[in-house]
A protein has these predicted regions:
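Conserved N-terminal structural module of periplasmic/extracytoplasmic solute-binding proteins
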Residues: 1-53, 61-70, 114, 235, ...
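Extracytoplasmic/periplasmic substrate-recognition and gating elements
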Residues: 6-7, 32, 86, 109-110, ...
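A local structural motif
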Residues: 6-17, 110-114, 189-202, 233-238
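Short helix-initiation/N-cap motifs at beta->coil->alpha
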Residues: 16-25, 44, 117-123, 199-213
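Hinge/lid segment of periplasmic solute-binding proteins
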Residues: 44-99, 123, 150, 179, ...
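Short, solvent-exposed loop/beta-turn-alpha elements that line the ligand-binding surface or hinge
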Residues: 60-75, 158-182, 232-233, 246-256
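Extracytoplasmic/periplasmic solute-binding protein
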Residues: 81-93, 98, 123-172, 188, ...
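Glycine-centered hinge/linker elements that transmit conformational signals in sensory
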Residues: 126-128, 169-200
Length: 287
């Protein structure tokens, strides 16, 4: 807004509140090659679709041009680097990490002294919590990415990016990869044994946040993007944290806290003129 006011420019912002509706609309824009000047885009299938139609500005080159490449966090650069050509096509929204939060009072009530370090311990703790009449885990099941996290935990800890890259390339599958098969069984257990909240499949992430931070459920997978919601409970000593557990019986990498760039921004190559480049520099200076 400030940039446009200074330059005497008009601007239009399109808001789509529902995540799945947003993805659908973004795909429509990609299919018709009518992407807006700037658009939110997760790193993955949708960004690849944009790249396939040559619709993305090379953000890495632009950061090198204006001197901000050396100021970019290395983990964020790695996260947004394209696996095919090594370029960076998305501008990071921020630096985020993800982890499990848990309510200490419910753990104590269930006789759980330490946070789980393996998925086997995680499920055992869920049963102890359920035995106390409490909801073990809150999840926003209507937002697919929430459940996908549970499918990704085990292969990520065991193979790093190897499985997901192989899955996308068609060279690996959930039926062939042992860590991925483990993840399928884990998610099945959590859903069928009643460890998720009732009706979890119709609960979106925002509602899941409201449930957990409103006092329902023992465990919630979230991250630094929602840390402000946890402030009161944390200040009162009610919350604990633990990273993604190990997959027992397999060789796990030491990294257990996912780090990412959030919902990154793409710049439409077709409309990236001198004014847009000037705005890009303004973003870098003021973001």
């Amino acid at each position: 807004k400030n940039f446009c006011d200074e330059k005497g420019l008009d601007y239009e912002i399109e808001l789509v509140n529902d995540m799945q509706d947003y993805f659908t609309k973004l795909q429509m824009y990609i299919n018709s090659d009518t992407l807006p000047d700037i658009f939110g885009c997760p790193n993955g299938t949708l960004s690849k679709a944009c790249k396939d139609i040559d619709a993305l500005v090379n953000v890495g080159d632009e950061l090198e041009r204006n001197g901000y490449d050396e100021k970019l966090n290395g983990a964020i650069r790695d996260f947004l680097t394209d696996a095919d050509d090594g370029n960076m096509y998305l501008f990071p929204q921020g630096l985020y990490c993800e982890y499990f939060m848990y309510r200490k009072d419910i753990f104590e009530k269930a006789g759980i002294k330490d946070a789980p370090t393996t998925w086997e311990e995680f499920e055992e703790d869920c049963q102890k919590i359920a035995d106390q009449g409490e909801i073990p885990v809150i999840v926003g099941g209507s937002d697919a990415w929430q459940l996908m996290r549970y499918l990704s935990f085990s292969p990520w800890r065991v193979t790093g990016p190897e499985f997901i890259e192989g899955y996308q390339a068609g060279t690996d599958s959930f039926s062939d990869n042992e860590s991925a098969k483990y993840a399928v069984n884990l998610l099945s257990d959590l859903g069928t044994k009643g460890y998720f909240e009732p009706g979890f499949a119709s609960v979106d992430f925002t509602s899941a946040c409201n449930l957990f931070f409103g006092g329902s459920g023992a465990i919630f997978y979230t991250g630094s993007g929602q840390i402000s919601l946890a402030e009161e409970m944390y200040d009162n000593g009610e919350l604990g944290f633990f990273p993604v557990p190990d997959t027992e019986g397999m060789d796990n990498m030491s990294t257990n806290v996912p780090v990412h760039a959030g919902f990154a921004e793409g710049f439409n190559k077709a409309t990236y003129d001198d004014t847009m480049q000037e705005f890009f520099d303004y973003m870098c200076e003021n973001f």
